[in-house]
Curated annotation (Swiss-Prot):
This is Transcription factor bHLH138. PROSITE patterns: BHLH. Residues 1-18 have a biased composition (Basic and acidic residues). The keyword Protein biosynthesis does not apply. Coiled coil: none annotated.
Amino acid sequence: MERYTKKNERFKAEEGKGSKKSRTFLTERERRALFNDRFFDLKNLIPNPTKGGEASIVQDGIVYINELQRLVSELKYLVEKKKCGARHNNIEVDNKNTIYGTSKIEHPFSKNKNTFNCLIRTLRFVHHF
């Protein structure tokens, strides 16, 4: 049962009239509910969130996105390195990036010109990100 107060009475009267103030209040309430839902969704996407506050959720999201970007650049580097090794060793690579053949491990700064050029291309590629 709702308690009677002047504030409730005033709100009900304004709500009945469809005044600008009541529409603004309802719009603001919907906006806050939408933000709360979005923060809840973001919090569920972040592994091991620290706290439940909005600021800490955003901060955790920033840290997590930066980690993911770093991981993506490392993986791109490894893929490029593997492709360079496959080209250098005349290994066949199909469209699904499956490598067939055997490879030999060389020192990255060997005197072989192809290995050095491939290393330079890879470093430029990683530096771009």
